[in-house]
Amino acid sequence: RICISTLAGVPSIVFGLFGLAFFLNTIGVSESKSVLAGALTLALLILPTIIRSSEEAIKAVPNSYKEAALGLGAGRWHTIMTIILPAALPGILTGMVISMGRAAGETAPIIFTAAVSIGAPIALLETLTQPTPALPWNIYNLCTEHEAVDEIRHVQFGMVFTLIAIVLLLNLIAIIMRARISKKLRG
């Protein structure tokens, strides 16, 4: 738990530098920035959040469920797989979707591992090993490096609105999924 809490507190730029050093320079998942390196780095970034939300969801399952299943003769693994995990599933899925929303808005990790300002169209098979244009990076780029910042302000606002809409949509999906799964589990 201490390690997960520590990882959750690490700034995203540190994850980006780690992704650059480990996935690109050490392992060499691709020759340069790539979607795969960015995805692996973002997966590490959101892992603590998913673990913590899953842990909390499992803890929230009433102890009486476990005791009832064990009392009726179910084994430990059978109880975990058929009683505890299905009851915790709404919380686990909610944590996963909210974590994806966080990953969608992160700029620092993808600056080092995946993003380019403008990308040329690439073949589908080469998608994972090539750099990609990314919305958060383009927003940052337009705000800091464009020559006519005032003239393209509407583009910046549109991109920010799109990013916020994506994150809100992911959160809404998490809420709907949680409600539907909870309703199914209750019967």
Question: What are the language-model segments listed below?
Answer:
Residues 53-54, 76-114:
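Transmembrane alpha-helices
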Residues 110-164:
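Interhelical loop and adjacent transmembrane-helix boundary motif
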Residues 55-59, 63, 70, 97, ...:
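C-terminal transmembrane helix and the adjacent membrane-cytosol boundary/short C-terminal tail
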Residues 24-49:
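Loop-to-helix entry region at the N-terminal start of transmembrane alpha-helices
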Residues 64, 75-76:
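Short coil/turn motifs that cap or connect alpha-helices
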Residues 1-8, 24, 28, 154-157:
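Alpha-helical membrane-interface segments at transmembrane helix boundaries
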Residues 1-19, 52-53, 186-187:
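Cytoplasmic-entry segments and transmembrane alpha-helices of multi-pass inner-membrane transporters
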